[in-house]
């Protein structure tokens, strides 16, 4: 039996689709607050006046929790200290506002009760530790949630072994987004943002300063958000452009202390993990709100990188790590499409020994804490090492874990993306907890995805797959632009192996690299072909009912199949292959998809109960889509 038929829907996901509305008595006129289903509601409570630097510390010694209760579901949502409640605009570091962000998954009436308590290190203590109650004005109330609007997608939830799905629309999510710059949040207009060191290690991407995104300022349009007199237009314009070009996700670090960029952290300073910067985090939220509400983008939140995975509590999920994760969940976990990534290049590899690394026990503890504390059950993944051995050492002990839901695969060479995806889709399903697998960093590390007009010089004798087959590649010389190869071997390779898409990494030494990227138009062509590929799958391929298989075609072709119903055969080099339909009854309509030029043509019909030869209609890579015709 195929793995998707064995997959059990989560209780939470079923609740979102199947529950009845709440109390009929409560209406928009009688409730304390109103919001549409899946809309964001900020509830501000007037509590004790304090500051980011106060004693008792509002981030360690207070805990705000709000319980939201619907007839069919109860959510316990962590809150946070919000200074004056308008810190993004005022820059305030003091005030008496305590806030919770709530995004209701069910229409009808909700009741809420907020509890603020005080005690030494109470913020990270077990929930059973009560602390001393602190009065809150407006601690109880009601929320009336109207039905979702006609264009509402809802939250991304796990309702399939290999794919996420929008809870309201039911559409499956395939990812095509930006994996660079990883230090997106090192932006000049965010308060308290700077580099804490000007040292660069050999082989790192280098940046001359913070991001400005001046090339995207013109992409900001009237009505878009900004803060403090018009700040933020560069980064808001940047994500506007990216979404308009077809990208639907962005990968970014929220803490790179001691890492490559050394310019992103949520704290007041880079060396005190007990106090957060309220105005900076409120400004991050302006960006995230725009990406979510206005652009429909996934937030791929990478919580640490390899150089700092033991910075907090030596890698354990101790007080510092719990405090950090709780603040991220409280402020940002409500968004519709959040992926929590426990760390970039997480775990042991040959270079992480010098920094310290998390072992599998620590990794699983971190994932478990995220799963336990996040009321919205957001997607949890780990970013891997690039080569087979270290990746296998990292992932094997994590197989079968219930909290970890997916992989952000790093793959050393483009031609290995299919095999890497296929291996871990299969292994995870065999261990009872299938992973959603995307390729989120493609190697080699120095190159990634070339700019549209760019070529680079090979650093390690890397051979472009297409160039090798054409005559040997160009090691240690200028290489041909690799976008076409990455489209075929990485994006198509991942999708045909049962993966869920890709985010594009820009390498250490290419123009607009992984740290220094200032203009996403440098890869404009890549965003367009990524969108076209995913649009083809979304519009024409019933991929959620299909499984990757190596049994029906010889090497050189990749196949997704729902045997007896539908088949997709991809030929990365074009040419001819055979498709074994000996066990498939009926007649099949054949359509050819020209993957490079985004064109579909009719290929006639193909009979079942035989091995059939299929030949691409022209040079280049093609996909054959076969669907059984009605008798």
Show the residue positions of the predicted features.
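Bacterial N-terminal signal peptides that target proteins for export
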Residues: 1-8
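C-terminal motif of bacterial Sec signal peptides marking the signal peptidase cleavage site
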Residues: 17-18
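Non-catalytic, glycine-rich low-complexity segments
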Residues: 22-71, 77-78, 83, 142-147, ...
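Aromatic- and carboxylate-lined catalytic core of secreted/periplasmic carbohydrate-active enzymes
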Residues: 50-52, 436-437, 444-451, 458-604, ...
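Ligand-binding face of N-terminal immunoglobulin V-set domains in extracellular IgSF glycoproteins
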Residues: 55-60, 64, 77-143
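Active-site mouth of glycoside hydrolases
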Residues: 63, 119-121, 150-418
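Solvent-exposed beta-strand/loop surfaces of large extracellular or lumenal domains
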Residues: 72-91, 594-611
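Extracellular glycoside hydrolase catalytic/binding regions
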Residues: 323, 344-516, 521
């Amino acid at each position: 039996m195929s793995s998707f038929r064995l997959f059990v829907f989560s209780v939470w996901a079923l609740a979102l689709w199947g529950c009845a509305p709440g109390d009929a008595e409560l209406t928009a006129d009688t409730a304390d607050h109103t919001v549409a289903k899946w809309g964001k509601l900020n509830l501000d409570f007037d509590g004790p006046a304090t500051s980011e630097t106060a004693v008792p510390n509002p981030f360690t010694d207070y805990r705000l929790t709000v319980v939201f209760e619907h007839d069919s579901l109860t959510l316990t949502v962590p809150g946070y200290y919000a200074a004056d409640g308008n810190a993004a605009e005022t820059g305030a570091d003091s005030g008496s506002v305590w806030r919770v962000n709530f995004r209701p998954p069910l229409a009808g009436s909700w009741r809420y009760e907020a509890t603020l308590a005080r005690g030494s290190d109470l913020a990270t203590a077990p929930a059973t530790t009560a602390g001393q109650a602190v009065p809150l004005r407006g601690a109880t109330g009601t929320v009336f949630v109207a039905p979702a609007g006609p264009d509402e997608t809802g939250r991304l939830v796990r309702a399939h072994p290999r794919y996420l799905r929008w809870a309201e629309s039911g559409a499956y999510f395939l990812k095509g987004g930006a994996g660079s710059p990883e230090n997106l949040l090192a932006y000049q207009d965010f308060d308290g943002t700077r580099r804490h060191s000007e040292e660069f290690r050999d082989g790192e991407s280098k940046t001359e300063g913070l991001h400005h995104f001046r090339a995207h300022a013109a992409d900001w349009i009237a009505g878009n958000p900004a803060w403090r007199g018009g700040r933020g237009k560069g980064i808001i314009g940047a994500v506007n452009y990216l979404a308009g070009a077809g990208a639907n996700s962005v990968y970014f670090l929220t803490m790179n202390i001691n890492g490559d960029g050394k310019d992103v952290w949520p704290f007041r300073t880079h060396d005190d993990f007990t106090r957060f910067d309220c105005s900076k985090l409120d400004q991050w939220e302006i960006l995230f709100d725009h990406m979510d509400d206005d652009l429909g983008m996934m937030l791929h939140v990478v919580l640490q990188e390899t150089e700092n995975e033991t910075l907090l509590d030596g890698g354990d999920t101790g007080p510092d790590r719990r405090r950090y994760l709780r603040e991220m969940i409280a402020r940002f976990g409500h968004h519709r499409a959040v992926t929590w990534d426990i760390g970039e290049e997480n775990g042991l590899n040959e270079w992480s020994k010098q920094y310290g690394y998390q072992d599998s026990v620590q990794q699983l503890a971190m994932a478990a804490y995220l799963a336990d504390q996040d009321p919205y059950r957001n997607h949890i993944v780990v970013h891997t090492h690039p080569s087979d051995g270290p990746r296998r050492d990292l992932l094997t002990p994590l197989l079968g874990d219930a909290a970890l839901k997916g992989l952000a695969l790093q793959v050393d060479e483009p031609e290995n993306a299919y095999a890497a995806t296929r291996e871990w889709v299969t292994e995870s399903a065999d261990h009872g907890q299938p992973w959603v697998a995307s390729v989120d960093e493609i190697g080699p590390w120095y190159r990634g995805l070339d700019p549209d007009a760019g070529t680079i010089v090979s650093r390690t004798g890397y051979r472009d797959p297409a160039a090798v087959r054409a005559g040997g590649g160009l090691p240690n010389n200028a290489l041909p632009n690799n976008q076409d190869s990455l489209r075929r071997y990485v994006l198509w390779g991942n999708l045909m192996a049962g993966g869920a898409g890709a985010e594009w990494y820009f390498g250490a030494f290419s123009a607009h690299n992984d740290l220094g990227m200032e203009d996403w138009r440098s890869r404009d062509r890549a965003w367009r072909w990524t969108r076209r590929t995913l649009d083809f799958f979304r519009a024409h391929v019933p991929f959620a009912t299909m499984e990757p298989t190596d049994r029906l075609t010889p090497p050189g072709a990749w196949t997704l199949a729902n045997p007896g119903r539908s088949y997709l055969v991809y030929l990365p080099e074009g040419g001819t292959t055979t498709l074994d339909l000996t066990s498939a009854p009926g007649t099949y309509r054949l359509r050819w998809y020209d993957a490079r030029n985004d064109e579909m043509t009719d290929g006639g019909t193909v009979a079942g109960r035989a091995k059939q030869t299929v030949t691409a209609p022209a040079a280049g890579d093609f996909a054959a889509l076969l669907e059984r015709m009605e008798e």
